[in-house]
UniProtKB/Swiss-Prot annotation:
Domain KH type-2, residue spans: 43-118
Entries under PROSITE patterns matching the protein: RIBOSOMAL_S3
Encoding gene (name): rps3
UniProt KW Ribonucleoprotein keyword: yes
Protein name per its UniProtKB record: Small ribosomal subunit protein uS3c
Superkingdom as given in the UniProt entry: Eukaryota
Taxonomy of the source species: Eukaryota, Viridiplantae, Streptophyta, Embryophyta, Tracheophyta
Keywords, ordered alphabetically: Plastid, Ribonucleoprotein, Ribosomal protein, RNA-binding, rRNA-binding
Length: 219
């Protein structure tokens, strides 16, 4: 059942790194872990509520959190930072203040920075958001999948696999549809593979979108 494992956790320490970096006492570990989840959810909700409405996607690839004794460093990797910054020039400072109010960090200073991703459509999270917007707008799932693959190919990826599961096109019986282009070596640990699982809420129910992107082979 090797194919059932999460491709990112499978490659930790080889081609993947942890998205959180901190040390904690065993008794405080679960609290710190929950705090990370809450911070990520809060940032995603804030970006969703304050971005340009026409875009329909957050454009967040991942959120990296590093905690020290006196500092909490949050780095937001975004494909389209203009979506947030153009509407509110003081967006980052405002987010920082709101986050500080929401969470009691005590003596720890909070620092938030935004890093732009060069090729946004080479990231599975941003591609999954793109597919979600298409499906919510009643675009055919095949058309949405093919367009996503075209965008990924323009971002110089070696291979991509897109899978949609659930009541596809509103059919009564749930099924799994997938499409692959190029190489996607899911069993090779040295393969630099990026992965994302994304739920899409449609009028027919929840669809599960999964995307595997093969970037490169680790030396």
């Amino acid at each position: 059942m090797g194919q059932k494992i999460n491709p990112l956790g499978f490659r930790l320490g080889t081609t993947q790194d942890h998205h959180s970096l901190w040390f904690s006492q065993p008794k405080n570990y679960s609290e710190s872990l929950q705090e990370d989840k809450k911070i990520r959810d809060f940032i995603k909700n804030y970006v969703q509520n304050n971005m340009i409405k026409a875009s329909g996607a957050e454009g967040i690839a991942r959120i990296y959190i590093q905690k020290r004794i006196d500092l909490i460093q949050v780095v937001i990797f975004m494909g389209f930072p203009k979506l947030l910054i153009e509407t509110r020039p003081q967006g980052i400072k405002e987010l920082q203040r709101t986050l500080q109010k929401e969470f009691n960090f005590g003596n720890q200073k909070l620092n938030i920075t935004i890093t732009r991703i060069e090729k946004p459509y080479g990231n599975p999270n941003i591609l999954a958001e793109f597919i979600a917007v298409q499906l919510k707008n009643r675009v055919s799932f095949r058309k949405a999948m093919k367009k996503a693959i075209e965008l990924a190919e323009q971002a110089d990826t070696k291979g991509i696999q897109v899978q949609i599961a659930g009541r596809v096109d509103g059919k009564e019986i749930a099924r799994v549809e997938w499409i692959r282009e190029g190489r996607v070596p899911r069993q090779t640990i040295r393969a630099n593979l990026d992965y994302c699982s994304y739920p899409v809420r449609t009028i027919y129910g929840v669809l599960g979108v999964k995307i595997w992107i093969f970037l490169d082979q680790a030396k």
